[in-house]
Amino acid sequence: MKSYFPDILNLLKVSSGDLLEIGSGEGDFLLYAAQNSNFKVQGYDVIEHAGRDPNRKTRVKNKLVNAGLNEQDYIWLSNKDILPFKDGSFNAIVSIQTIEHIKNTERVFSEIQRLLKPGGLALHYFPSAEILIDPHSGVPLAHKFPTKTKEILSFFSLLGFGKYKLYADKHNYSKNEFINEFDNYLSNKCFYRKLNYYINLSEKIGLNSWYSPPPPLQNFSFLTKLVSYFTSIYLFQKKTI
């Protein structure tokens, strides 16, 4: 369980109805929500993001089924697939560390607007373009200068910053393998955008939106911009009609 899972459930303000998670990954939040709320949970991920682990789909399915969820509660789709849910299906929609990986954000936000029930709330926890340290590689500024990503990864890894040692220990990576892996990952699978982009896009498609820092700084919204340089933030979207 991630430390922010309880915060996410608390921030939704409701604990029952239908909940959809976008980008469910290993299914950990689905399990947590199913076991710690009265939500009927569903999740999906895209097959293109399943990664290099060929057993991931089977492993996640077995984990969810063994915990009492239905196999149909977690589906895999292609990037080009339309979400197979009816209009107004969900009281709550959640994404965790997913938004920065979505290339066509307008399409996904439009689907959120379609899928939320009136009064429903979407909550996204993710790093914006303001963040100074790329959370995937752990390397400062690695995502800030697309034409210099390799050089930045190499420089900071040489100084001991980032996750190179973790990957060396866990996957037996050489430094060049680590650099090439994250150069490709940041170039092709990460699409960092600034906070105001998400706010403006949400409003454009008819969702009231705001953002805030993580608890316990929730009551200090004036710190959100500052906090966004150092950690992920929460983006809220509410469907009013």
Feature map (PLM): residue ranges:
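Conserved class I S-adenosyl-L-methionine
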Residues: 16-25
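A structural alpha-helix within SAM-dependent methyltransferase catalytic domains
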Residues: 31-34, 109-113
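A short acidic, Gly/Pro-enriched loop at the edge of an enzyme's catalytic core
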Residues: 81-92
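S-adenosyl-L-methionine-dependent methyltransferase catalytic module, highlighting the catalytic core
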Residues: 106-108, 121-241
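Class I SAM-dependent methyltransferase SAM/SAH-binding core
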Residues: 28, 32-81
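Conserved alpha-helix/loop element of class I SAM-dependent methyltransferases that forms part
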Residues: 1-16
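Helix-to-beta-strand junctions that scaffold the AdoMet/dcAdoMet cofactor pocket
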Residues: 102-103, 116-118
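A short SAM/SAH-binding and catalytic strip from SAM-dependent methyltransferases
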Residues: 91-103
